[in-house]
Swiss-Prot record:
The modification Phosphothreonine is found at T96. Keywords: Acetylation, ATP-binding, Cell cycle, Cell division, Coiled coil, Cytoplasm, Cytoskeleton, Developmental protein, Differentiation, Lysosome, Microtubule, Mitosis, Motor protein, Neurogenesis, Nucleotide-binding, Phosphoprotein. This is Kinesin-like protein KIF2A. Belongs to the TRAFAC class myosin-kinesin ATPase superfamily. Kinesin family. MCAK/KIF2 subfamily. It is found in: Cytoplasm; Cytoplasm, Cytoskeleton; Cytoplasm, Cytoskeleton, Microtubule organizing center, Centrosome; Cytoplasm, Cytoskeleton, Spindle pole. Interacts with AURKA and PLK1. Interacts with PSRC1. Interacts with MCRS1; the interaction enhances recruitment of KIF2A to the minus ends of spindle microtubules which promotes chromosome alignment. Its main location: cytoplasm. Residues 122-139 have a biased composition (Polar residues). One of its GO terms (cellular component) is GABA-ergic synapse.
Amino acid sequence: MATANFGKIQIGIYVEIKRSDGRIHQAMVTSLNEDNESVTVEWIENGDTKGKEIDLESIFSLNPDLVPDEDIEPSPELPPPSSSSKVNKIVKNRRTVAAVKNDPPPRDNRVVGSARARPSQLPEQSSSAQQNGSVSDISPVQAAKKEFGPPSRRKSNCVKEVEKLQEKREKRRLQQQELREKRAQDVDATNPNYEIMCMIRDFRGSLDYRPLTTADPIDEHRICVCVRKRPLNKKETQMKDLDVITIPSKDVVMVHEPKQKVDLTRYLENQTFRFDYAFDDSAPNEMVYRFTARPLVETIFERGMATCFAYGQTGSGKTHTMGGDFSGKNQDCSKGIYALAARDVFLMLKKPNYKKLELQVYATFFEIYSGKVFDLLNRKTKLRVLEDGKQQVQVVGLQEREVKCVEDVLKLIDIGNSCRTSGQTSANAHSSRSHAVFQIILRRKGKLHGKFSLIDLAGNERGADTSSADRQTRLEGAEINKSLLALKECIRALGRNKPHTPFRASKLTQVLRDSFIGENSRTCMIATISPGMASCENTLNTLRYANRVKELTVNPAAAGDVHPIMHHPPSQIDDLETQWGVGSSPQRDDLKLLCEQNEEEVSPQLFTFHEAVSQMVEMEEQVVEDHRAVFQESIRWIEDEKALLEMTEEVDYDVDSYATQLEAILEQKIDILTELRDKVKSFRAALQEEEQASKQINPKRPRAL
């Protein structure tokens, strides 16, 4: 009898069901549950099999063709019930209700005749029916069903599970709300980025901190790359900027970059970088020096070449690291790497094994600005960089000052820092626009014994200013961009022991050529980063650059990478090659090689721009040199012409001789000045070519190096 209640529903057939979100679709019947008069159905959604338990009433309401047929004959006194009433009675599965309705109910028990009686009234209905003797017309099964009446709709297991999940969800939401309220009390709610602040704090709470300490061992590296984080400065604190840099261990740096989804939901993208050493904002200069530059001091006493670079955005702490602590605008040079390295050099000189060498210590300090070299110890005199027949790079006119103690070094540093070129950029109001190179040179009987070069590089955000409307700004950005690319490739070549180093691609690497060549050369790079969220992009650029420098040194399998040669359309520069004779110069070859090795960072348009700038700088130097030679020649012409004029004052001077000599002087003047004029015209054409190339720059990655 119970199976008949399911009507035409069978296991394996498909029925229409209604989901909780209102969707109606088909599902397959997998079981019939007689105990609670329900069926279990399953369907496939998004590749997953899902199931649900549904009562018969819901099934029959959506699938009326599955309703069971009436198997009890209606009373002959009553007309056949209509199809609608039949369906309504069967839906409730109470087929005895029709017989009960046939007898008029007692007046004191009107509820019995109602097919929609509430469950609380059903016991009274049952007792009243028994008192009136109506039970004799009903079968025992029907009587039992009538005694309990139409039961309330029983909850399926799925519904119970959903209710449990909903209850847990509400409880969890309440806890989260309480937690948010508690956090709001702990943080400054007026900070527009307090949500990001809470995310960063929660993330840091899950980290295991093991920072670098002075007790950690110093590893031997031919190329050492480390990162130093500075604390938030006064301006950033006033602006309520957030610290988005975390250094959980001695060699790991994490950047919490704030991002925003399409629905304006904010979230963090945590990026991790690994280096040789990572210094947090509590590390003093002495600790940074101990792990970076100090191991290089002994190299120069072993007839080696050492270099230490400070790289990063302006204001990130490069000059603080290299020059010393600041107290307002005054700098304590005794706490910088310059002075610390000089101190150790003089201490090493006193050791017995080095004292017998009778070494002399010299120092130089110069800057490289827009591809030109200036002596900071000689009133910023412009210097020339030439390569001799032995392929040794010579900085003509650079003064070397002998130093006897650390105090002498500090005086030279003060003199040089006061002359260094600086200016305003898009990132900072006071940006170092030049590379400052301080060198400690050891000589033995006048011959070079070792050299330690300490370089405070220009702010790397300046390298993004290659499309500026101002030519001087463009040239600054182009030279910084090119020199940083060349520096990276030279360090890579040093780490891989490559046969060729593209040092001629920039003035910086050309001057430091001897530091990248030779078995006894060592390099250290200190990447300084700002912790503020406002500097996040520049910080990521600095970390990516430093990571690429070290990344390839530990991956020798990539040494055989071959990059296709870039082809560029002919330009006006190519037309000038024949006249100027610099088309196949070593500088241009190294520049092309440099751009080919960095195709992911240098677009063809940017390469054309760098090529135009290099060509223009070479032509500028040649025009200035020729102009200087013409000027010197003009002085001689004046003397010759003065002698001719004095000759004409004589009574019987030789007119033929006068005319011949004057004509010779004029022809010489015309030839030299015509040649200079042609070069000036070509130089102006190169200036226009550079301006056109700057307007077509479309770098593949719109960021500074």
